[in-house]
Amino acid sequence: MTAEEMKAAESGAQSAPLPLEGVDISPKQDEGVLKVIKREGTGTETPMIGDRVFVHYTGWLLDGTKFDSSLDRKDKFSFDLGKGEVIKAWDIAVATMKVGELCRITCKPEYAYGSAGSPPKIPPNATLVFEVELFEFKGEDLTDDEDGGIIRRIRTRGEGYARPNDGAIVEVALEGYYKDRLFDQRELRFEVGEGESLDLPCGLEKAIQRMEKGEHSILYLKPSYAFGNAGKEKFQIPPYAELKYEVHLKSFEKAKESWEMSSEEKLEQSAIVKERGTVYFKEGKYKQALLQYKKIVSWLEYESSFSSEEVQKAQALRLASHLNLAMCHLKLQAFSAAVESCNKALELDSNNEKGLFRRGEAHLAVNDFDLARADFQKVLQLYPSNKAAKAQLAVCQQRIRKQIAREKKLYANMFERLAEEENKAKAEVAAGDHPMDTEMKDERNDVAGSQSQVETEA
């Protein structure tokens, strides 16, 4: 029976008391949730905790009174399974359904609206009956932009509400799959942010930071959150590959948050992290280095309790971090971000040689030649012996000359075409066969003929 057939069958038919029947699917086996399958679904998969599910439903009281129906609204109802967005009976029952399945669910009050009811349609302590049809379900998108790059499906819910933060020590068991081929199977203990050194994709670390202790989840990673356009030769993963991971977060120890650290701790940790970032940078692990330098900025940027001596140390670390961030962004070809990091560095030291030079490089990379030239000229004004700036300024000048030459040629061709068209039009007018001239002659003949006709008729 389809959703439309359900609606047709229900119209006026549910007037007699409804029977209590079905298989007990309540966790306590207390007959709190009874289920009868009216039409089998397809496939073998059922929704998991956190999945977005899409259903049509109709609800009745036990006396047959209908109190709600998504069919009447002609709009499917959706919710996140297992998140407490609906009554308990629904979270329990829909988790057992397959796509296309139609079932009847009978819910005791403690699995529905309890002693409070849901006025005015549902009285206190009401047993409810629903018919539910499952159309679709999909995993939870964990990306900031909701671009579908990291999809999570929770096999087993974790405990509590705490989650690993950046720098937390996590203990995980994982399996990585590429097209059903198991390519990675390990138990690891590592610091969040260090995953790249263990050949873990960035999307996996990002997902781990959304997990709870004891959680077992399936993760689907798009290429930009997996091994990207480089692939991973060690695992025989080609470029632009989509991956699947099964991850069990066994335990974790949270790192101290910024607000939990003293000013002295922040400076000590920043110095350690700076060295770690430098090691990653030298190894060509620019994303890893980026994470380290970002930590320093987050710890020090808004700290107001430093002593006068600590302020100088903090400023030096912040300046170095912004400059190093700019260098990482340049290596990763994130040129706008590189400019932003240079600007932050130049706010701390307006004549900083590296800040001006790296900003010039970022401008040059995106063909902002005038801005790049200004930065390189400023470097040479302040530091005349900077050979790299001289070389880059020469590149700028050369590209600006080429750009001017291209524009001159473009405009010359444009003006030449316009002149040719103008001369051609003049020649056609002189010959009397210009389209506009012909049209005007036709119009004059039409007008003359009309006038003659009017005069004759008059």
From Swiss-Prot:
Modified positions (Phosphothreonine) in chain numbering: 143
Biased amino acid composition, Basic and acidic residues: 434-446
Coiled coil: none
Modified residues (Phosphoserine): 450, 452
Classification via Gene3D superfamilies: 3.10.50.40, Tetratricopeptide repeat domain
Modified residues (N-acetylmethionine): 1
Polar residues bias spans: 448-458
Cited InterPro entries: FKBP4/5/8-like, PPIase_dom_sf, PPIase_FKBP_dom, TPR-like_helical_dom_sf, TPR_2, TPR_rpt
Region (Interaction with tubulin): 267-400
Record's comment describing the protein's domains: The C-terminal region (AA 375-458) is required to prevent tubulin polymerization.
PANTHER family referenced in this protein's UniProt entry, alphabetically: PEPTIDYLPROLYL ISOMERASE
Protein name, UniProt field: Peptidyl-prolyl cis-trans isomerase FKBP4
Organism: Oryctolagus cuniculus (Rabbit)
